[in-house]
């Protein structure tokens, strides 16, 4: 088995908090120096690298003299604002030793949910890569709340991979990779060297939370790999404690767990729809509509809609769920939630008489729909 990183041209590397901080006591400058050296080495082989780095909140806690991670959202936001300054300074200094420019890019999931902002972020990152710059990406924790409370940079790494159509995502952690069970509790736990991303059994294997400094456990990494696979990107989960781990992966050495993408890339438009993390609404559809969407490749017609949930406008991305509540697809709606409630369970021929106008005969056209 050879590392998929060897053939990858464009790589997103995610480094967790525990690998860039001194056990939460501010940034570990020596560790960051090693990451800069390894990424500079990758750049020397012709690979493009985007770095997703945690550590801002931990650095802010150190600068503010806080020993424990606060629970108040505004205190977390303040720590992120203070710490982001130090994070950018250290990376700029360390990469500068190799003549490499860096760029700070702070994103929120909302940036990637809006189509125009999504395309702007994509264009900016691709331009930076073409200029030989290494983008350093982090969540903009200072202006968001849900992401600090529930989010993680594993997910952000997958979103960025899809955004720039990366070939591979490398998630570096303080664990060796994925085991069939928690090796600390189960002596029969076996290491998983390679598997297909999105395999349901993987989520059952993963579990447990991260450290008190970081937020992500193994499950978030498995889900990130599943998301990255939708754009055809392979994921490697490996220990950042391994010496020269990036260089060895790029040389083809199999380190950690490889989660391979089972399918090819989605189109850019459908990838954008699939990457929405926060949807304004969803429709419950009947079993017949589920079958037509998932097996027949058909559009969603109003007659197949059983219930409309949430409030949304025409042109927004909404979820389509089975009668049991499982999301099966998502897409761009041709009608608002108020209009959808009026035309639900009705044939398309009655839309105009009910609403007084006809946008489209479909609630969601198949060209604007992606299966999940």
From Swiss-Prot:
Residues where ATP binds: 14, 173-174
Entries under InterPro entries matching the protein: AceGlu_kinase-like_sf, Asp/Glu/Uridylate_kinase, G5K_ProB, Glu/AcGlu_kinase, Glu_5kinase, Glu_5kinase/COase_Synthase, Glutamate_5-kinase_CS, PUA
Recorded catalytic activity of this chain's protein: L-glutamate + ATP = L-glutamyl 5-phosphate + ADP
The organism's place on the tree of life at top rank: Bacteria
Entry's Gene Ontology cellular component terms: cytosol
Keyword field: Amino-acid biosynthesis, ATP-binding, Cytoplasm, Kinase, Nucleotide-binding, Proline biosynthesis, Transferase
GO molecular function, one term: RNA binding
GO biological process per UniProt: L-proline biosynthetic process
EC number(s) recorded for this UniProt protein: 2.7.2.11
HAMAP family linked to this entry: ProB (MF_00456)
Its biological purpose: Catalyzes the transfer of a phosphate group to glutamate to form L-glutamate 5-phosphate.
Protein's recorded name: Glutamate 5-kinase
UniProt lineage: Bacteria, Pseudomonadati, Pseudomonadota, Betaproteobacteria, Burkholderiales
């Amino acid at each position: 088995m050879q590392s998929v990183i060897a053939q990858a041209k464009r790589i997103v590397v995610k480094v967790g908090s525990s690998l860039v901080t001194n056990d939460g006591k501010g940034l570990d400058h020596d560790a960051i120096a090693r990451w800069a050296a390894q990424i500079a080495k990758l750049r020397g082989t012709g690979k493009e690298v985007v770095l997703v780095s945690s550590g801002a909140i931990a650095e802010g806690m150190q600068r503010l003299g806080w020993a424990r991670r606060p629970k108040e959202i505004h205190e977390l936001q303040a720590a992120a604002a203070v710490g982001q300054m130090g994070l950018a300074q250290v990376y700029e200094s360390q990469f500068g030793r190799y003549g490499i420019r860096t760029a700070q890019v702070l994103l929120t999931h909302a940036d990637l949910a809006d189509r125009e902002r999504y395309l702007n972020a994509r264009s900016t990152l691709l331009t930076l890569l073409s200029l030989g710059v290494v983008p350093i990406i982090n969540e903009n924790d200072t202006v968001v709340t849900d992401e600090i409370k529930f989010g993680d940079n594993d997910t952000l790494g997958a979103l960025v991979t899809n955004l720039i159509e990366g070939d591979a995502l490398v998630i570096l952690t303080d664990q060796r990779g994925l085991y069939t069970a928690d090796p600390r509790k189960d002596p029969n736990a076996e290491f998983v060297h390679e598997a297909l991303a999105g395999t349901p059994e993987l989520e059952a294997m993963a579990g447990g939370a991260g450290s008190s400094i970081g937020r992500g456990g193994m499950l978030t990494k498995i889900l990130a790999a599943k998301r990255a696979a939708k754009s055809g990107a392979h994921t490697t989960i490996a220990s950042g404690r391994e010496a020269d781990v990036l260089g060895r992966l790029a040389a083809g050495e199999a380190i950690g767990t490889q989660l391979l993408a089972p399918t090819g890339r989605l189109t850019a438009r459908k990838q954008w729809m699939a990457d929405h993390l926060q949807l304004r609404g969803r429709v419950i559809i009947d079993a017949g509509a589920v079958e037509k969407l998932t097996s027949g490749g058909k559009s969603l017609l109003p007659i197949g809609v059983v219930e409309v949930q949430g409030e949304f406008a025409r042109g927004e991305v909404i979820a389509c769920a089975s009668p049991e509540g499982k999301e099966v697809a998502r897409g761009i709606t041709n009608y608002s939630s108020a209009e959808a409630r009026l035309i639900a369970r009705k044939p398309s021929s009655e839309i105009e008489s009910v609403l007084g106008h006809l946008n489209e005969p479909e609630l969601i056209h198949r060209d604007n729909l992606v299966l999940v």
